[in-house]
From Swiss-Prot:
The gene is rcf1. Belongs to the RCF1 family. Cytochrome c oxidase subunit which plays a role in assembly of respiratory supercomplexes. GO terms for biological process: mitochondrial respirasome assembly. This is Respiratory supercomplex factor 1, mitochondrial. It is found in: Mitochondrion membrane. Keywords: Membrane, Mitochondrion, Transmembrane, Transmembrane helix. Residues 134-154 have a biased composition (Basic and acidic residues). Associates with the respiratory chain complex III/complex IV supercomplex. It is a multi-pass membrane protein. Its main location: mitochondrion. The keyword Transmembrane helix applies.
């Protein structure tokens, strides 16, 4: 339940799906086909004007420059008309993109918080284990030493204090483990 995204009114609408740049280009080309047509007409007029200039035909060159201006005007009108026609759809798309961005930011934030919680839990568990080990070590250190017999004292006097076996951390943990069972 926690991993599922919240339902959205735009979720089932195929018009508002995330799209790649190529898909966006194709969609815009289908929505406003007059703009690329005007750009192509402008480029063709410039090409013809260039060819006329190379040929030395100034009359044809002037006609093509005028045609270029008309083609640019047509392109500009197509841009303005398309902008007015698709204004509401673009606003909806911007709102959808904002929602997608907010959802991604929220998912990133939630993942970060989950990771922090996991780290905090691991740290808390480690501290508890460390405290238990410390307590077991202190308890093992407080145990009274076994009473020595006089014969053992003579034999032990040859053993240096550094060679004596002391209770280590592993023994303390083992003792703690046995007490819990």
């Amino acid at each position: 339940m926690l991993n599922e995204p919240l339902p959205s009114s735009m979720e089932d609408n195929p018009q508002f799906k995330e799209e790649t740049s190529l898909q966006k280009f194709r969609r815009r080309l289908k929505e406003e086909p007059l703009i690329p047509l005007g750009c192509a007409a402008t480029c063709y007029a410039l090409y013809r004007a260039y060819r006329s200039m190379k040929a030395g035909d100034s009359v044809e060159m002037n006609k093509m420059f005028r045609a270029r201006i008309y083609a640019q005007f047509f392109t500009l009108v197509a841009v303005v008309a398309g902008g007015m026609y698709y204004k509401t759809e673009r606003q909806q798309r911007r709102e959808f993109e904002k929602m997608v961005e907010q959802r991604k930011a929220q998912e990133k934030r939630d993942a970060w918080l989950r990771e922090l919680e996991i780290r905090d839990k691991e740290d808390k568990d480690w501290r508890e284990r460390h405290a238990a080990i410390e307590a077991a070590a202190k308890e093992a250190g407080k145990r009274p030493a076994p009473k020595k017999l006089p014969e053992q004292d003579a034999a032990r006097s040859a053993i240096e204090p550094a060679d004596e076996r002391s209770i280590g951390v592993l023994s303390a943990v083992r003792d703690l483990w046995m007490q819990q069972k």
